[in-house]
Every structure is written in structure tokens, then in C-alpha cells.
């Protein structure tokens, strides 16, 4: 467990926390509420939730071509305009919580839009940030992109929480898109419901409790993570090859599609359909093949996987040594 990060100095009587909010399916909002509830219930904390609203809203359930049409801009971090924020940038927050969904192995476009907004640079400069991810199971390269966006704002990333769908990878390749396109988590009978499970959402309150306690001791002013020992981020390096292949695919095809036309333009559709064929082929061949090869080579790759896991678990880690302190 990381050492306490308390700095001896006069405390402000109330800690101000900024929480960004954009949840297309509603599940990320549930996770955020679970985390934020202990902070809202504390008399020592004042929580401001800033709901992000794209000028052109993203539907849920997503229509098929609208879903595909989001990937070129997602892959290239080309964000849409947002409705005006309620913040001016002159506000002073002690901690910023940035929850986000993973869209096409990148942060969701509304969150990207906020982080590229001039107001975000004013708000986040020098501020400690906790990121919270809710996704299928591939988030490592999206978090790398998030780190770049936060660095551009001058923010200090203290912690990362990643909550994922517990179902097998090949199962979620079907259940997650069907959820997004149908609006039903259990669209296919006999398969597990898509998304983060209810128990994990409820248990996420431990992060809010730990943040509350850390804020009480001014630990956010230092550089050490606040959520160690709480199994905040348990990465799976065996998925990294698939993430890299898909990220490169999204980027290259996204570049082509952006050259063909802008978001929503009909002339993109033939190329989007062509990409679907390519993507399905990729999913049915490269993904299972890479998982099989890595399983066979796991004894030879143990050291490499251990190093990758340590890298992507950071800064909060996957240890469980403090879990008993915050069990509900």
C-alpha cells in the first residue's frame, strides 16, 4: 500500500469536487452515483456534477449506421461541439473526477470534447484527477489517450478506476453491440446481460469512501494515488495485441472515412458497410487467434505480461489489501 500522502497545512473546511457526467446508456451514471454518494453525504465535501450535452445528441439505442459513424472521429479524437457549460473556468476545485465510456478504444467523444475545451484547461490545470472507466473489457489504450488529454490540460492523474463486463471476451463481442443497438442488456436469451454487473456497481462505493477519507487528510495535494489496495484497475495484458490491432484499424479506416465525408453524410455509408465486413472478419479471426497463441505462449510471456500489467494497473493498482476497510 502506498504511504499516506498527507501534507501539513491549514485545511479548507469544505473540499470542492468536480464530477463530469456523460452516460449514453445510463450505466456509467449509476457507477458514478455509487462512487460519489459518500462524498455527497459528507459535510466536508461539496460536489458539483457537470452534465455534458453534445449539440447533436448521441441516441440510445444507437441506430446501426449512427453507431458506426462515430468511430472515425472517436479514433482521431475529433470532438463534437457541446452545449455551453455551467462553469466559467474560474472555479477552484480540490479534486476532479472524470468518468468515461470507451468508444472504439478511445474516450467517448463528449468527454474528449470537454477535455479539449478551453474551459477545461482553466479548470484542470494543476488539479488532481481520478478517472473512472466503464466498458466491455478493453480500456488500456483508451486510458493512454486519456492521459494525453489530461496532460494537455495540465492536470495531475492520481488514480484510475476501471469497471468491466465480467463475461468472456468472445461473448461480449456480441452482447455489447446488441445492447447498444437494441437498448436491451439481455437481448439474447441464454447469454449473460451486457455491461458491468450490479454487484460491481454497488461495490464501487468503496472508491468514494476512500476518496472522502483521503480528502479529509489533504492527501489529494500530493502525488501518491488515493485508491491503492482497492482493486481499482485490474488490467488484462493478453488483450493488448487485440487492442493494438483494432486501434490501428479504427485509425486507418477512420482516416479514409473522414476523407470521404463528415459525420452523418450519406456518402460515408458504403465505406462503413465495407468496414463492417472487414471488422467482422477481424473479430472472427485475429481476436480468437491472438488469444489462442497467447494462451499457448503464456509460460514464455509471463515476465512480459507481468510488466505490462504493472504498467496498465497503475497508478491505483489491482491490490486488495484495503478492501476489508471499505467493504459494505
Give the label of every model feature segment:
Residues 2-99, 105-110, 116, 211-328:
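N-terminal beta1-alpha1-beta2 submodule of the flavodoxin-like/Rossmannoid cofactor-binding fold
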Residues 59-64, 143-144, 169-175:
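Short aromatic-enriched loop/helix-cap "lid" or pocket-rim segments at secondary-structure transitions
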Residues 71-73, 149-156, 176-188:
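A polyampholytic, Gly/Pro-enriched intrinsically disordered region
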Residues 84, 102, 137, 141:
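Internal, well-ordered alpha/beta segment that forms a basic, Gly-enriched binding/recognition surface
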Residues 112-116, 146-149:
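Glycine-rich, phosphate-binding/catalytic loops in enzymes
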Residues 120-126:
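Short, conserved loop/helix-junction motifs that constitute active-site signature segments
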Residues 128-170:
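Short, glycine-/small-residue-rich phosphate/pyrophosphate-handling segment
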Residues 168-246:
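Glycine-rich phosphate/pyrophosphate-binding loop and the adjoining helix
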Amino acid at each position: 500500500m502506498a504511504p499516506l500522502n498527507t501534507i501539513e497545512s491549514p485545511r479548507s473546511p469544505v473540499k470542492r469536487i468536480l464530477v463530469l457526467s456523460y452516460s449514453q446508456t445510463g450505466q456509467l451514471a449509476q457507477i458514478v452515483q455509487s462512487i460519489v454518494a459518500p462524498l455527497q453525504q459528507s459535510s466536508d465535501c461539496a460536489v458539483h456534477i457537470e452534465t455534458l450535452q453534445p449539440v447533436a445528441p448521441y441516441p440510445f439505442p444507437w441506430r446501426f449506421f449512427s453507431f458506426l459513424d462515430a468511430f472515425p472521429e472517436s479514433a482521431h479524437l475529433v470532438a463534437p461541439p457541446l452545449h455551453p457549460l455551467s462553469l466559467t473556468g474560474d472555479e477552484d476545485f480540490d479534486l476532479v473526477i472524470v468518468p468515461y465510456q470507451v468508444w472504439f478504444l478511445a474516450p467517448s467523444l463528449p468527454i474528449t470534447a470537454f477535455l479539449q475545451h478551453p474551459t477545461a484547461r482553466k479548470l484542470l490545470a494543476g488539479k488532481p484527477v481520478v478517472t473512472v472507466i466503464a466498458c466491455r473489457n478493453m480500456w488500456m489504450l483508451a486510458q493512454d489517450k486519456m492521459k494525453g488529454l489530461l496532460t494537455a490540460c495540465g492536470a495531475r492523474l492520481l488514480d484510475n478506476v476501471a469497471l468491466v463486463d465480467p463475461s468472456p471476451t468472445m461473448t461480449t463481442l456480441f452482447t455489447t453491440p446488441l445492447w447498444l443497438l437494441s437498448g436491451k442488456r439481455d437481448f439474447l436469451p441464454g447469454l449473460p446481460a451486457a455491461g458491468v454487473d450490479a454487484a460491481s456497481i454497488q461495490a464501487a462505493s468503496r472508491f468514494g469512501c476512500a476518496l472522502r477519507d483521503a480528502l479529509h487528510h489533504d492527501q489529494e495535494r500530493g502525488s501518491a494515488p488515493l485508491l491503492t489496495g482497492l482493486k481499482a484497475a485490474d488490467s488484462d495484458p493478453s488483450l493488448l495485441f487485440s487492442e493494438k490491432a483494432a486501434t490501428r484499424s479504427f485509425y486507418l479506416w477512420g482516416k479514409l472515412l473522414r476523407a470521404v465525408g463528415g459525420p452523418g453524410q450519406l456518402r460515408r455509408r458504403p465505406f462503413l458497410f465495407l468496414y463492417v465486413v472487414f471488422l467482422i472478419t477481424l473479430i472472427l479471426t485475429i481476436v480468437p487467434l491472438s488469444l489462442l497463441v497467447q494462451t499457448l505462449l503464456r509460460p514464455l510471456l509471463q515476465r512480459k505480461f507481468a510488466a505490462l500489467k504493472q504498467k496498465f494497473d497503475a497508478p491505483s493498482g489491482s491490490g486488495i489489501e484495503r478492501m476489508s476497510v471499505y467493504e459494505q
